[in-house]
Amino acid sequence: MSVQSITESNQPPVICLMGPTASGKTALAMALKDALPCDIVSVDSALIYRDMDIGTAKPTKSELVQYPHRLIDLRDASESYSAADFCRDALVEIAEIRSNGRIPLLVGGTMMYFKSLIEGISPLPTANPEIRQAIEAEALSKGWQAMHDQLAEIDPVSAERIHPNDPQRITRALEVYRLTSNTLTQLTQIKGAKLAGDVLQLAITPRERSTLHERIALRYQQMIDLGFEQEVIKLKSRDDLHQDLPSIRCVGYRQMWQHLEGEFDHDEMIFRGVCATRQLAKRQLTWLRNWPDLHWLTTDDKTNLAQVLSLLEAKH
C-alpha cells in the first residue's frame, strides 16, 4: 500500500514518536517529514517557552523553516502550561492536520502529555489563589494534621494516598472539593476528550544505556558552547522570573541558575546538569517500559524510516 493510500483510505493516522532526551527523536521526525505528508506537533513541556531555545534543544530557526513544529513558543517563561492545556491545544492541531488529509506526527519526551492525550485527562479545576490562601491560613491556625483529618472526612480515598506531611497535595485536594463540591477521587474517575482514530506509538532509544549517557553529556557541552549561560543570564535579568517557576525548573536551567547565583562553580554546574538530564532520561524510560502497544526503534538504526513506513502500511 502506498503512502498516498494511507492518507486517503481513512482518517489519517496519528504517529506518536516518544523517547528519552537526546535519543534522536527530532532527527527521525525530520526524516519522517521528508518521507510522509505529515505535520510535526511538539510534545515537550520545555519547548512551549519562548526565549528558551538552547537549553531546551529547540530546533534551530533554519530547521523550523524547513520542518515547522506546532505547539512551541506558546508561553512566556513567567507563565505556566498544564497537561490539560496541552490536550486542548493538541486536539485542535490534530483535527486541523487531519482535515487537510495529512498525518499528525507528535514528537517529544513529556510522557504525561502523551498519556493525557491518549487516555484523556480528568476535568480538574485550575488553581484558585483565594481558596488556597484560605486553606493555608486555616492550616496555620489548626495545623496540617487537622487539615488532613478534614480531608479524610470528605475524601477518605485521597486522604489514604496523601501523607499528612504533604501540605501541597492536601491543599489541592481540599481546593478541588471547595471549588466543585466533588472530591478529587470522584473527578479523577472522569476522563475528558482524548485522541481518537488510528494511533501508531513509537519509542526510540539507543541500544545501550552508556550510549544514551554519552549523547546526553555531548549535547550538554554543545549547549554550553552555543551560549546556554548567556541565555540564562538574560532570563535571570528579568524581575519576574525565579527558581520556583516551571520554566526555570526545567532540567539544565535550574542548575545554570544556581551556578549564576554562586551556589557552585562552572564544572559543578555541568556535572549537576548532566546528572539531572540522566535522571530525566531514566524516568522517561521507566514510563515507556510500561507503555502498551509500543513499537521500539533503535537510535541511529538506518532502517528506522523503513520500519515506520512498514508499520503504517500494516495498519491500513
UniProtKB/Swiss-Prot annotation:
Catalytic activity: adenosine(37) in tRNA + dimethylallyl diphosphate = N(6)-dimethylallyladenosine(37) in tRNA + diphosphate
SUPFAM superfamilies, per database record: P-loop containing nucleoside triphosphate hydrolases
InterPro entries attached to this UniProt entry: Dimethylallyltransferase (IPR039657), IPT (IPR018022), P-loop_NTPase (IPR027417)
Coiled-coil features, chain-numbered ranges: none
Cited HAMAP family: IPP_trans
The protein's assembly and partners: Monomer.
Protein name: tRNA dimethylallyltransferase
Gene assigned in the entry: miaA
